[in-house]
Amino acid sequence: MEVNEAGRILAGQLGESFSNMEWACRAFKSENHLLRLKAPSTLTMRWLLNVLKSFRENHAKPKIEIASVWMDFDTVDFSREPYDCAILLGNGYFGESTESRLLFSEWLIPVCTPSLLEPARHQLPECDLIHPSPDRRDWKRWLKRTGLFPGLDMGGGIVFDTLEQGSLAAMHGHGVAMADLRLTLDALKSGLLALPFREAIATGDGYYLVWPKNSLRGQSIERLLAWLNLNAPVVPSLDIVCLDFNEKRI
């Protein structure tokens, strides 16, 4: 018996359909066993690795497979990228096909080594400013919101791609960096970094756990979300002046 052209086409279509069914079944069966997570590099190094370590110590399932990547602007395309969920910095909207929950808000504040405290406080225009992004947006936002040092030249300084790189440069005494307050708590507590100013500004963005709507891994994602919320960094009493969008003390 010989299969004709129509039969070969049908066989190919059936083979593709069965492959899709097999993939879906595998995804369903692995619901409680593996969760693939995408996260920004600074957040991963400063907070997430320790939180995931404690998650593994307290939960047998799911296993978390993390990919820490550099992103100029945090995005994820679940239809093209091999992730089940992601932690992204943004305003909470990451597309109509996604769900998201806020973990914590972003607050920016200048940091430097203890030896640079006084020069930074009183002679900031003479100090090297460390920028965690090429567009220098974080220093611009902080200066505008606080009203300090009007007319400060933004043309010079040291430019990096991430908050992590900027913070490391500040730790080595290369200048005054703009940092995320919550992600810098350990360095502040250990004395590696200090706060020349007490004004922290809200950017309006925050770190969100994001996942596709109708995900087959919903239970695992909810379990991870609960643990992330439980271990969100809390700012201690540091006499911080937190400025919201209306520049009011809160």
Model-derived regions, located:
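Hydrophobic hinge/microswitch elements
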Residues: 151-196, 202
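Central regulatory/effector-binding core of bacterial HTH transcription factors
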Residues: 33-94, 243-246, 250
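C-terminal effector-binding regulatory domain of bacterial HTH transcription factors
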Residues: 57, 61, 185-190, 200-250
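Alpha-helical "hinge/linker" immediately C-terminal to small N-terminal DNA-binding modules
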Residues: 1-30
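Immediate post-signal peptide segment of exported/extracytoplasmic ligand-binding proteins
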Residues: 29-35, 124-125
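Hydrophobic residues within well-ordered alpha-helices
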Residues: 7, 78-79, 168-173, 188, ...
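Acidic, Gly/Pro-rich loop/turn segments at junctions of secondary structure
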Residues: 67-128, 134-138, 143-151, 157-159
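Short, well-ordered beta-strand segments
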Residues: 36-38, 86, 130, 177, ...
